[in-house]
Design a protein with these regions (language model features):
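Short runs within selected transmembrane alpha-helices of multi-pass transporters and secretion channels
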Residues: 147-165, 173-181, 202-215, 296-300, ...
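N-terminal transmembrane alpha-helices
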Residues: 12-44, 48-52, 65-80, 84, ...
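Small-residue hotspots at the loop-to-helix junctions and early N-terminal turns
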Residues: 54-65, 144, 203, 276-291, ...
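Transmembrane alpha-helix boundary and packing residues in multipass membrane permease domains
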Residues: 28, 32, 44, 83, ...
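Short alpha-helical transmembrane segments in multi-pass integral membrane proteins
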Residues: 1-25, 85-152, 194-249, 307-372, ...
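Helix-terminus/linker motif at the lipid-water interface of multi-pass membrane proteins
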Residues: 33, 37-58, 127-134, 190-197, ...
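Small-residue-rich hydrophobic transmembrane alpha-helices
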Residues: 57-117, 154-173, 267, 281-339, ...
Length: 466
C-alpha cells in the first residue's frame, strides 16, 4: 500500500460550512493576493523606469496573453486534479487520491517543459500579433524570454498548491506563495534598478521566486505533515485518469486561455484606435482588476474543496449552504469594490504610473470597465459550484459563453459603432458581466441547486439518491 504520512482527516462534513470555507479562504486569499504581487509589483517598478516607463509598461502588458497560456495549463491540471482529489478524500479512498496527485504532478512538469520550447520559438510573431510595435517589442521580448525559461516552476507552484489547500492546509498554501512573493519584492528593485537590468531583471526576480515556491510545495507534499503524500510511484500516467483531470480542469483552462484571447483582442483593437497609450491603459486596468478580484477568487477556490468533500460524503444540504455563503460574500464584496473604484480611480491608477497622459486616459476607461462589477461574482459563484461537483461541461460552457461569445466579438465590434472608439473596448466588459454572470448563476440554480434538493429529499426518505 502507498505510504500515507498522516492520519488526520480535515473532515469538511463537520462544523460550520461557512467556517470551513473561511478557514481556507482567509489564507488562500492572502496567498492569491501575494501571488498577484508577483506580476503587479513588476508593473509598479517598471512603470517608474526612467525615460521609457510608458513603453516598458505597455511592453510588459503585451506579454499577458502568453503568461495566461502558462497559467491556463497550470489550471488545467491543478484545478482539474484537486476537485477529483477532494471527492476521493470525501469517499475515503486515499489510494486513489494519491494517484490523482501523482498524475497531476507529472502532467504539470511535462507540459511545462513543452510550453517553454514552443513559446520561445513562437514569441516574436505572437507578440507582434498581440499588438506590439517596434517601440514596445524589445521590452516585451526581454521580459518574456527569461520568464519562459522558468515556466515549469510557475506551473509546479500553482498546480501543486491546489493539493495543499485541498487537504485543508490553507496556511501552508499561503506560505507557498508568500515565500516566493517576498523574494520577488526584495529582488525586483535590486535587479531592475541597482543592476540596471530593467524588464529582464523583473522577469529574473519572478522566476527565481517561483522556483522557491515550487520547491516548498513539493517538499511539503513529500513530507510527513501531508495527509496524502506525493510519491514517485504514483506518477505513472493513467490515460483514463488523465482524461478525467483534463475534462474537469478544462473549465479553468478555458477561463485562463480565454483571458488570453480577450487580451489579444483588446490590445490589437486598442493599438488600432488609440495606439500604445491605450494599450498601457489596459495594462493598468488589468493590474487593478487582478488585485481587487483576488478575494472572490480566494472564497470561490476555498469553497470548492469544501463543497466537493460534502458532495462525496452525500451531505447535500451542506453543499447548498456553501453555495449560498459563497454568493453572499462575493456579491457584497464586489459591490463595495465597484463603489471604491468609481469614487477613487486616481488612487488605484497612481499605483502603476506617474505619467499624466496615462492617468488622464485611464480614469474614464476605468469607470466604464468596472461598471456593474458585482455581476462578475455571480459567474464566479456559479462556476465554482459546477467545478466543485465535477460538472465540467457546464463550467466550460459558461467560460466560453462570456469571454468568447460575448466579450471578444463586442471588443472587436463596439469601437466601430456610434463613434465609441476605444471606449467600446472597455464597454464590452460590463455588458459581458451582466449577460454572462446572470445566465451562469440562473443555470446553476436550475440544475445543481435543484439536484441538491432532490438528493437531500431522497436521502431523508431512505431512498438511494439518483
Amino acid at each position: 500500500m502507498p505510504h500515507m504520512a498522516n492520519t488526520q482527516t480535515n473532515d469538511f462534513s463537520k462544523g460550520s460550512v461557512a467556517g470551513n470555507i473561511l478557514r481556507l479562504a482567509l489564507p488562500m486569499t492572502v496567498a492569491q493576493l501575494i501571488n498577484v504581487l508577483y506580476s503587479v509589483v513588476d508593473r509598479m517598478y517598471i512603470g517608474r523606469l526612467p525615460d521609457a516607463a510608458g513603453n516598458a509598461l505597455t511592453g510588459l502588458g503585451l506579454t499577458f496573453p502568453i503568461l495566461s497560456i502558462v497559467t491556463a495549463f497550470a489550471n488545467l491540471f491543478g484545478m482539474g486534479g484537486s476537485p477529483l482529489f477532494s471527492i476521493q478524500r470525501g469517499k475515503g479512498d486515499r489510494d486513489r487520491a494519491q494517484v490523482i496527485l501523482g498524475n497531476t504532478f507529472a502532467l504539470l512538469v511535462g507540459t511545462g517543459v513543452a510550453l517553454t520550447v514552443v513559446l520561445l520559438v513562437l514569441k516574436r510573431p505572437l507578440l507582434y500579433a498581440f499588438g506590439a510595435s517596434d517601440a514596445t517589442y524589445p521590452y516585451a521580448d526581454g521580459y518574456l524570454t527569461i520568464y519562459l525559461l522558468g515556466s515549469v516552476f510557475v506551473m509546479i507552484s500553482l498546480g501543486m498548491n491546489q493539493f495543499i489547500n485541498a487537504q485543508g492546509f490553507g496556511r501552508t498554501g499561503m506560505l507557498t506563495v508568500l515565500i516566493g512573493a517576498v523574494t520577488n519584492i526584495l529582488l525586483d528593485p535590486v535587479f531592475i534598478f541597482v543592476l540596471g537590468m530593467g524588464v529582464q531583471g523583473a522577469a529574473l526576480a519572478t522566476i527565481l521566486s517561483q522556483f522557491l515556491s515550487a520547491v516548498w510545495a513539493v517538499s511539503f507534499l513529500r513530507g510527513k505533515k501531508a495527509l496524502i503524500r506525493l510519491e514517485w510511484g504514483s506518477m505513472r500516467l493513467q490515460p483514463k485518469l488523465v482524461w478525467q483531470i483534463v475534462s474537469l480542469g478544462f473549465s479553468s483552462f478555458v477561463m485562463a486561455i480565454t483571458n488570453s484571447i480577450v487580451q489579444v483582442a483588446c490590445n490589437s483593437t486598442l493599438q488600432s484606435f488609440g495606439g500604445d497609450l491605450y494599450v498601457g491603459v489596459m495594462t493598468i486596468i488589468n493590474s487593478v482588476r487582478e488585485v481587487v478580484s483576488t478575494p472572490i477568487n480566494g472564497v470561490t477556490s476555498a469553497a470548492q474543496p469544501v463543497m466537493g468533500f460534502n458532495y462525496g460524503a452525500q451531505e447535500y444540504r451542506r453543499v447548498r449552504s456553501g453555495i449560498v455563503f459563497t454568493t453572499i460574500v462575493c456579491v457584497v464584496y464586489t459591490t463595495a469594490v465597484w463603489l471604491l473604484l468609481f469614487l477613487f480611480p486616481r488612487f488605484f491608477i497612481g499605483l502603476f504610473t506617474g505619467e499624466e497622459a496615462l492617468r488622464e486616459a485611464a480614469v474614464p476607461s476605468m469607470h466604464i470597465y468596472f461598471f456593474g462589477f458585482f455581476m462578475m461574482s455571480l459567474q464566479m459563484a456559479g462556476q465554482s459550484a459546477a467545478v466543485a461537483l465535477g460538472r465540467s461541461k457546464q463550467a466550460v460552457f459558461f467560460s466560453l459563453f462570456r469571454k468568447v461569445i460575448i466579450v471578444t466579438p463586442l471588443t472587436l465590434l463596439l469601437p466601430h459603432l456610434f463613434g465609441l472608439g476605444v471606449n467600446g473596448v472597455f464597454l464590452a466588459e460590463p455588458i459581458s458581466n451582466f449577460i454572462g454572470g446572470g445566465a451562469c448563476y440562473i443555470t446553476m440554480l436550475l440544475t445543481i441547486w435543484r439536484e441538491m434538493n432532490r438528493k437531500e429529499k431522497a436521502k431523508l426518505s431512505g431512498e438511494a439518491p439518483q
